[in-house]
Amino acid sequence: MSATSIQPLLDILFLGKALTREQTASLFSTLIQGEMNEAVMAAMLMALKIRGETIAEISGAADAMRAAAKPFPYPASSRSQGIIDIVGTGGDGFNTINISTTAAFVAAAAGAKVAKHGNRSVSSKSGSSDLLAQFGIDLTMSPELASRCLESLNLCFLFAPHYHGGVKHAVPVRQALKTRTLFNVLGPLINPARPEFMLLGVYSPELVTPIARVLQALGTQRAMVVHGSGLDEVALHGSTQVAELKDGEIIEYQLTPADFGVPQAQISELEGGEPAQNAQITQSILQGQGSDAHTHAVAINAGCALYLCGLSDSVKAGTALALNTIKSGKAFELLNQLAKVSSEAQE
């Protein structure tokens, strides 16, 4: 859309009124095509933020980003089983170990098909992509190779900038604004594999139910949107607020570590470090040699994923399956297999 054709939509925003899903998609399409100047972009993002983004607006922005993404060739057998993403918005302010990334290896080794959409760090010193790079896993693996990994190994990692090139147009504005905008919640919603199932952690308890409604609007089959006592994942150090999407309905409840059959730990026990240190921690967990707190934090998140995929009938059973999978060594074996496939492709 040209500057003149988006002006009526901007005028609606500047009056403090909400846009429709389609109108928001039009604005974000213009942005990611590089056809929106930075002053307009900043004004648009702040107008949305100050009023508060609606479900329709978040869904519309996600529609535009999904439509513009580099295609992912979805493997047939994975489609019949269904794919899950275990992902967080980041930005929770805690520098924890890489819980969701490590949980992805465990869930995949236990039988789930995991397509993890990730980026470099937002709130910690080490995001999922920072961690994977430590293991020699190629972040810019072709979509075709990633699809083959999903098919044969049950796991692939999709590096967000590799699939969403248009986001680069927003980077200078986001850096200049130095505040959260709609982009902070979009990342988990725009996985190019379009997973049927999602375990999605959010940085604020106020986002739990709205983001579940967005997933509902986007056609996600089953999901748990979680905020765990300050963390954008299921908490081992306190209660977790959940909005679960199942059979088209959203139910809200709380979970505690006891619901997973594991003891509570202190948040300080989950503190992470630089990528190299976090890689060592992940390796220890997957080898069955991690601390109880590290292992349990990963297992309860993997357990929720296994529950959502239908591989266990409760989060407690899912956690037990995750712990057994770690003990078996299968998750560590999977890490080595993925690194091997990645390095062979780079030769």
From Swiss-Prot:
Database matches in InterPro entries: Anthranilate_Pribosyl_Tfrase (IPR005940), Glycosyl_Trfase_fam3 (IPR000312), Glycosyl_Trfase_fam3_N_dom (IPR017459), Glycosyl_Trfase_fam3_N_dom_sf (IPR036320), Nuc_phospho_transferase (IPR035902)
Chain positions recorded as Mg(2+) 2 binding sites: 232-233
EC number: 2.4.2.18
GO biological process terms held by the UniProt record: L-tryptophan biosynthetic process
Family indicated by similarity: Belongs to the anthranilate phosphoribosyltransferase family.
Binding site for Mg(2+) 1: 100, 233
Group of enzyme by EC: transferase
Entry binding sites for 5-phospho-alpha-D-ribose 1-diphosphate: 88, 91-92, 96, 98-101, 116-124, 128
This protein's pathway: Amino-acid biosynthesis; L-tryptophan biosynthesis; L-tryptophan from chorismate: step 2/5
Assigned GO CC terms: cytosol
Keyword Glycosyltransferase set for record: yes
Cofactor annotation comment: Binds 2 magnesium ions per monomer.
Protein name as catalogued: Anthranilate phosphoribosyltransferase
Catalytic activity as recorded in UniProt: N-(5-phospho-beta-D-ribosyl)anthranilate + diphosphate = 5-phospho-alpha-D-ribose 1-diphosphate + anthranilate
Subunit details: Homodimer.
The keyword Hydrolase appears for this protein: no
